């Protein structure tokens, strides 16, 4: 539809003109994701005012009060500028907006972008996000309009409480799938983590099962469970969307289930499971075999490590002849090897020895098995410890509605973006501070392109 020049000059970004007789009404609009039609749909936010050839723009309510303005419109037409792009907002910004359409002043993109940049730069709560937005408004306006300034802490709080975490998780996975394509064989660790201060009244603390690439050191996805014991039900759901073809999936004893093992094999992946006493006599049979039957020279590898006045020795034995074990436990037909790791630690003259046992669908050397298992152990230092000590995940008191879950995912987005640009000698917490000080560095982090 062609609009007259006198009406078009009052049209602003994210608005729409609608003809009313010899005048035009101006509405602010946005778009929302429609899950039924699987596309975005236009949504009217609010009536801004009317436009006539004689009087120009008349803001909503002024005509009712008998006031007809003269001069320029109070709604300034922003200059035509090329806004900068980020690699993640295309995937995250089309979230279904659950807020009431009345009085909405900030788009989904503006709130998400403010919160993410704030978290990257060290923000931990709603007030931090608001203060960051006010301080860095000129920087943020390089990416989005922010016609009403930075979102307040109450705006962020209401928005994140209402976001559908399931939809947000899926958009996170879509983004990370484009950001980091895993081509060569590597270890994918699945392990749970609790945010201990996220409880509130009857609402239990948040427990997330995280999927972590041990080589690229990025989070591939996550799944919320009500408590740690429910990891068993969460892992099969994770494996539904996780591409494990050609990779090694490592899971601790909680997830050592033959149904999970079969699911990984069906998806053309391999597994290494830690053994404990949750599978009947399986753990006892493997332990007894290593204690009485194994030759100390058969498929053996030893690794030494010395640092901080601590000497660690790890010995690994792997047995490929496991036909006897699959006959005793017919549900576990996918087992192709068993392993034992002896960890000896010497600290200031005190020596401790620990034994761990594993089952696997791999037929690899002891060295490869040990390296893969150590990759799984690294999830504690490379992910969980960083989330607690650098993002203060364990101390977060965001606890109402869906906000703990959604903010946990947002911290994962920030973690991945920082992980992709940090050097070996940099710490994540130091890099967060530097992003807050140096806008060029922050720009390089959020402009990280898909591979």
Predicted regions mapped to residue ranges:
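Dynamic "connector" segments at or just before major functional cores
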Residues: 1-189, 198, 210-222, 236, ...
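Short, flexible loop/turn motifs enriched in small residues
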Residues: 21-24, 200-207, 351-352, 379
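Short, conserved catalytic/metal-binding motifs centered on acidic residues
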Residues: 28, 114, 129, 152, ...
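Conserved beta-strand -> loop -> alpha-helix junction used to position metal-binding or nucleic-acid-contacting
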Residues: 46-49, 269-285
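Generic secondary-structure signature for well-ordered alpha-helical cores
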Residues: 165, 240, 291, 295, ...
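Polybasic low-complexity intrinsically disordered regions
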Residues: 178-251, 256-269
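An anionic, glycine-rich sequence signature occurring as long contiguous blocks
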Residues: 276-375
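A C-terminal functional module that forms or caps the active site or interfaces directly
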Residues: 338-418
């Amino acid at each position: 539809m062609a609009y007259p020049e006198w009406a078009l000059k009052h049209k602003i970004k994210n608005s729409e003109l609608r003809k009313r007789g010899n005048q035009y009404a101006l509405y602010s609009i946005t778009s929302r994701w429609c899950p039924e039609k699987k596309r975005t749909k236009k949504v009217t936010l609010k009536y801004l005012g009317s436009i006539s050839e004689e009087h120009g723009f008349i803001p909503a309510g002024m005509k009712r009060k008998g006031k007809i303005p003269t001069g320029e419109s109070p709604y300034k037409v922003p200059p035509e500028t090329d806004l900068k792009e980020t690699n993640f907002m295309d995937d995250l910004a089309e979230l279904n907006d659950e807020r009431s359409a009345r009085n909405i002043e900030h788009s989904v993109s503006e709130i998400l972008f403010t919160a993410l940049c704030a978290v990257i730069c060290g923000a931990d709560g709603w007030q931090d996000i608001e203060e960051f937005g006010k301080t860095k408004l000129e920087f943020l306006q390089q990416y989005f309009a922010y016609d009403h300034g930075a979102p307040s802490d109450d705006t962020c709080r209401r928005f994140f409480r209402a976001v559908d975490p399931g939809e947000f998780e899926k958009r996170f996975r879509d983004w990370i799938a484009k950001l980091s394509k895993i081509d060569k064989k590597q270890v994918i660790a699945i392990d749970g983590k609790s945010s201990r201060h996220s409880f509130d009244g009857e609402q239990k603390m948040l427990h997330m099962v995280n999927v972590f690439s041990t080589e690229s050191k990025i989070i591939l996805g996550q799944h919320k469970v009500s408590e740690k014991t429910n990891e068993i039900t969460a892992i099969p759901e994770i494996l539904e969307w996780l591409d494990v073809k050609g990779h090694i999936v490592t899971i601790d004893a909680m997830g050592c289930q033959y149904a999970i093992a079969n699911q990984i094999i069906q998806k053309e992946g391999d597994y290494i499971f830690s053994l404990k006493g949750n599978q009947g006599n399986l753990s006892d049979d493997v332990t007894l075999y290593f204690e009485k039957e194994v030759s100390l020279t058969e498929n053996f590898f030893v690794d030494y490590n010395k640092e901080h006045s601590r000497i660690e020795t790890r010995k690994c034995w792997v047995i490929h002849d496991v036909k006897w074990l699959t006959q005793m436990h017919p549900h576990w037909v996918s087992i192709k090897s068993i392993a034992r790791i002896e960890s000896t630690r010497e600290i200031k003259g005190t020596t401790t020895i620990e034994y761990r046992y594993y089952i696997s669908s791999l037929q690899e050397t002891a060295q490869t098995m040990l390296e893969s298992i150590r990759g799984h152990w690294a999830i504690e230092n490379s992910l969980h410890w960083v989330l607690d000590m650098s993002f203060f995940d364990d101390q977060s008191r965001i606890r109402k509605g869906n906000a703990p879950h959604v903010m946990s995912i947002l911290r994962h987005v920030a973690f991945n973006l920082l992980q992709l640009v940090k050097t070996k000698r940099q710490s994540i917490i130091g890099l967060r501070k530097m992003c807050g000080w140096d806008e060029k560095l922050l720009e390089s982090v959020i402009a990280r392109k898909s591979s």
